[in-house]
Amino acid sequence: MGPIMPPSKKPESTGISVSSQCYRSSTLSNPLHDDDDLDFPPPAVKINKEKGGMEDEELTNLNWLHESKNLLKSFGDTVLRSVSPVQDIDDDTPPSPAQSDMPYDAKQNPNCKPPYSFSCLIFMAIEDSPTKRLPVKDIYNWILEHFPYFANAPTGWKNSVRHNLSLNKCFKKVDKDRSQSIGKGSLWCIDPEYRQNLIQALKKTPYHPYSHVFNTPPTSPQAYQSTSVPPLWPGSTFFKKNGALLQVPPGVIQNGARVLNRGIFSGVRPLPINPIGAMAASVRNGIANCRTRMESEPSCGSPLVSSDPKDDHNYSSAKSANKRSSSPSDSISSSSADDHYEFAAKVCREGSDISFQSHESFSETEEEDKKQIKKELKDSLVESGYSSQHKKKQHLLKLRRIPSDALPLKKRRTEKPPESDDEEMKEAAGSLLHLAGIRSCLNNITNRTAKGQKEQKDKETTKN
């Protein structure tokens, strides 16, 4: 339903609809015709308000379309090009590139906010220092020196820098040197594990002047040398010194920190792939080879720990190290351990021979002592008559016993194991001690009775 106009303002010409007029005014491609016919006065809206609310929702005032040309000009070129795609009607020249595609220059636009995050600003400040570590106050000074915008900016940007330093994993604290006098605060450096992430964040800035170089990577490795990317903004001392940071092609960034040719990117230092872990792996391989040989050969007088993977927690690592040792690098790393093992094996073999001879002589003396003790015990038992009775009891018990194979499982479990020689020796020793105790008791009793008799005799003699 089109706008309702009073009879005095109705257009005389027929065949022109309101929709076609709105289309003409919205496109702004052709000059407007019949200004008298398209004049929509403000009272038209007031009349409709008196008629009802339903018609008011459907009607809109289109007077602002006539002033669109002046409104767009009043916004200015910078806002217009970055926000609205509508261009000046009278200008027939092709549109200029957007302001976001232009490189950022702090000298030309000192009041313009830089397009970098605070983590990128901190990264650039630390990398620009010769020692690759800075206190917080020096980071502030670097940002103020290279970006004049922050001189007049609110003071909250310093808090943002501090929060990024303390909360971001890319930055870590470093101990101060005694020679440095930086005052209060601690030094901050970049964690090498997250350095590549910061480089990627710098490359993703929308103000990069040569973003097409990263979007279309070269096909051949030789083309990497020719695609040299200038710094993000001209005249920067940081990128004059460390310009190679942002000259890494996208193929290298997508594949991580792997660099195809170190000669091409001399300024880029790839991330270390845990050198401590590599050293530990080589040492582990050498120890594992030594351990497996010691398991196969007799030990140097010490007992073998275990060959069961459940008992030995290093078993799996030793087996995996043996599989890895087939490579040439592992054989080189384990060569020194093999030399040490051969020398130790010779010494252990010589020591084992000496210890074995001494052990044999010591065992022979022990056996002779045991035989003598057994003979003495048997002689003492024969004198007491205990041995004959003990032998008879053992013989009767053997006759009464049922073979263990014929017993059920429960009785087999409850059945006590046969007494060993050590237990027999213990029983014999106990019986001897018991007999000795009885004899001592009898001797004491006889001595007491004898003393009592003597005392009585002495008393009787004294009375007489």
UniProtKB/Swiss-Prot annotation:
The cross-references to Pfam families, in alphabetical order and at most eight, read: Forkhead
Q: Name one GO cellular component term.
A: nucleus
* Ranges of Basic residues composition bias in the record: 389-401
Q: Which BP terms from GO are recorded?
A: negative regulation of DNA-templated transcription
Q: Where is the composition biased (Low complexity)?
A: 316-336
Where does this protein bind DNA? 113-209
> Which parts of the sequence are annotated with region: Disordered?
1-53, 85-108, 294-337, 381-428
Alphabetic keyword roster: Cell cycle, DNA-binding, Nucleus, Repressor, Transcription, Transcription regulation
Main localization of the protein described in the UniProt heading: nucleus
- Record's subcellular location: Nucleus
Q: Which GO terms describe its molecular function?
A: DNA-binding transcription factor activity; sequence-specific DNA binding
Compositionally biased spans, kind Polar residues = 14-30
Q: What does this gene product do?
A: Acts as a transcriptional repressor. May be involved in DNA damage-inducible cell cycle arrests (checkpoints).
This chain belongs to which protein, by name? Forkhead box protein N3
Instruction: Give the organism the record lists.
Output: Xenopus tropicalis
Lineage summary = Eukaryota, Metazoa, Chordata, Craniata, Vertebrata
- Tell me what gene encodes this: foxn3
